[in-house]
Every structure is written in C-alpha cells, then in structure tokens.
C-alpha cells in the first residue's frame, strides 16, 4: 500500500466561534479553487505549519497582503533552494557518483542534526533562534518565532531562501500570535483584543491522518483492526499475511524510508519466489507475549499525529519497531536476513515472477 498518510477528503478543520458572521471568502488549502483571485486583497492565513508557511510568501509574491494567524510559534529554518555542493559535484563527476555523495551528505547531516536536538535541546534551540533573529530581529522572533517546546518535539518548517522572512521584512506579510476569540464580519478578533481584517480567510489548520488510506480490510471474513496489531519493521503487521505499508520518516526525508520499504518488499518477493513460497506472515513469538508496548510514533507531540495515534499499530521490541531512524533501519531492513524466525512462510502455486530491487536505494 502506497496510498499516502492523510485523508484527501477530510482535512482537520476545527470550527471557530462566529464563523457564520464572516462576509468574505473562506477556503481550505486542500480544496484550493483554481480561479482564486487574490491580487491586491487582504488575506488571513490561519495556521503555522508547512502549508501556511508555503502559502504566505507565495501569495505575497502575487500581490496579496497576508496576515498569518498562529495559535503558537513553530521553529522555522531557512535553507537554500538549491544545493550548491550537489550542483558542483554534478559538473565534475558522473551523475551516479554525484548523487551518491550528495545523498550521503544529506542523510548524515540530517541524522546528526536530529540526534543533536534530542541530546542537546537547549543548545539547538538557541542556535535555531539565533538564525531566525539574524533574519528578523530579536523582537519579532521573541514574539512570534519562539516555540514553548524543544526542537523536533514537533516538526520544524524549512523555508527556501528565507522567502517567508523576506515577505515579513518587506511588509507584505505580518504575523499575529494568540488564540482566536471570534470571527467577525470583516475578519477575526483575538482574545487579547487584536483585530485582523481580510477579504479571504485560508484555514491552513492541518491534516487528518489515515491508516492504509482508510480502506477496510478483512482476513478470511474477519475485519482487521490495525490497532490490535504490532508493526513489523515499520511496514508489515503482525498476523496479517502479504501486506506492507509505506510510511516515511517524520524527522527526515519521507522518501528515505519509502525507498527502504520498496527495497525490502522486492527482497521478500524474490526470496519467496526462489523458495516457492506464496505467503509471508509476521507472527508474534512466545517471547513476544509480554514485551512492553509503545505508540506507533514516539517523542512527537504534533497535534495531527497525536489525534490519530489510536488508529495505528503498536510497537514492541526487536523487529516489532518503527524506529524512525534511517541508520538503524538500513541495518534492520536492508541487511538483516529475510528468514528471521518472525516471518512465517507458506507454500502455494502461482508464484509471481521475480522483481528487480530498486536501484535508487543502492547508494548511501
């Protein structure tokens, strides 16, 4: 299953007091109208996640005056839109070598940074706020870009070439932080009395996670309840045969884990073909009966994740883990033997032809 991880039909859309009073246009980013005309208009964007921080500078660049209204601040990091090292390597090295070196650089640096946020949160926080202050000034950062939590307790926002900062410094974007008291005919009133007016309100209020794209599965006529299962290597489910699910990293590039999952599935299918096996089922062993359990995702307090955690499989020990650690996953997923005493295989005819392993994951 590679169906994504959030609902395309039902975004997270809380109701606000007084919404019916508002006389302007209201829209959610998941249902963006193609003919939306906002040039020269005042726009209110409610939210402080990646969606809001992408929308705000984009709309200002096309002539809108935008106010981003956030309940609480988010860590924001400016990164170059283009990787100069990668571009230089491509000029002088074969494409395959340049790609491999760039990938190794990026995975190493992102892994190091995440581990630093866990081991030295105060130091990392000071570094991040220092970079933001260099772009916006101390007063702005203290008021609107200093989260109450530590880095990577929730996802951070990367902005290309500081585009959000540029919009703020140019005066085409503003930030208001606090709780919304009510909507009015012209916009919003905050609990501290601040009034925000706009012709359009964009509710960038988040996504709704789904498990297996919300599809109902059954096994021999019995409905499958995924919270009753344990995750196997972050991709399969205890007691459920021949089913794998792609779920990436929340603390690194999503596709790193998607690559590993695809490679493992190909390895597994080729192993089953070579051994005339048609069924592979992750199966709890007697020694797994009393292992401690944890949520599908640990040490991550983002609301969109915590709201839906009860729908996901549990974690345990050994292979029953969703590590969210690329270095560990490479060992567990790429190098560990297929026959590990946990996967139980069954025989049958009608074996599918062997599949080639993805070449993309052969580096790094």
Predicted stretch roles:
Residues 52, 74-78, 87-90, 231, ...:
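C-terminal, flexible cofactor-proximal segment of oxidoreductases
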Residues 66, 104-112, 143-144, 241-245, ...:
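Short acidic (Asp/Glu) and glycine-rich catalytic loops that position anionic groups and cofactors
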Residues 8, 106-115, 177-188, 310-333:
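Hydrophobic transmembrane alpha-helix bundles
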Residues 1-44, 48-50, 54-57, 61-68, ...:
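Flavin (primarily FAD) cofactor-binding/catalytic cores of flavoenzymes
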Residues 109-119, 149-153, 281-291:
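Charged, low-complexity surface segments at secondary-structure and domain boundaries
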């Amino acid at each position: 299953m590679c169906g994504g991880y959030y609902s395309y039909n039902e975004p997270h859309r809380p109701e606000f007091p007084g919404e019916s009073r508002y006389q302007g246009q209201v829209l959610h980013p998941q249902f963006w109208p193609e003919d939306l005309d906002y040039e020269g208009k005042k726009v209110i964007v409610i939210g402080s996640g990646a969606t809001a921080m992408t929308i705000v500078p984009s709309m200002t660049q096309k002539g809108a005056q935008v106010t981003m209204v956030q309940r609480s601040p988010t860590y924001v990091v400016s990164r170059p839109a283009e990787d100069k090292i990668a571009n230089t390597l491509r000029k002088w090295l074969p494409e395959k070598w340049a790609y491999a070196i760039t990938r190794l650089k990026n995975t190493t640096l992102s892994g190091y940074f995440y581990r630093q946020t866990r081991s030295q949160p105060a130091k990392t926080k000071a570094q991040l706020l220092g970079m933001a202050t260099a772009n916006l000034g101390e007063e702005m950062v203290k008021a609107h870009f200093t989260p109450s939590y530590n880095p990577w307790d929730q996802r951070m926002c990367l902005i290309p070439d500081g585009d959000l900062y540029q919009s703020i410094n140019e005066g085409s974007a503003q930030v208001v932080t606090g709780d919304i008291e009510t909507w009015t005919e012209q916009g919003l009133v905050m609990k501290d009395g601040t009034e925000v007016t706009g012709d359009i309100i964009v509710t960038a209020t988040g996504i709704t996670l789904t498990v297996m794209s919300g599809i109902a599965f059954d096994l021999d006529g019995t409905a499958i309840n995924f919270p009753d299962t344990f995750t196997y290597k972050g991709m399969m489910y205890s007691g459920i045969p021949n089913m794998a699910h792609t779920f990436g990293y929340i603390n690194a590039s999503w596709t790193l884990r998607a690559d590993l999952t695809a490679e493992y599935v190909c390895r597994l299918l080729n192993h089953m073909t070579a051994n005339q096996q048609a069924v592979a089922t992750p199966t709890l062993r007697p020694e797994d009966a009393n292992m401690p359990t944890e949520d599908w995702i640990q040490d991550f307090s983002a609301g969109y994740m915590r709201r839906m955690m009860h729908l996901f499989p549990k974690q345990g020990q050994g292979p029953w883990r969703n590590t969210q650690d690329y270095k560990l996953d490479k060992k567990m997923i790429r190098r560990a033997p297929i026959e590990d005493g946990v996967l139980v295989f069954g025989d049958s005819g009608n074996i599918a032809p062997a599949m080639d392993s993805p070449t993309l994951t052969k580096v790094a």
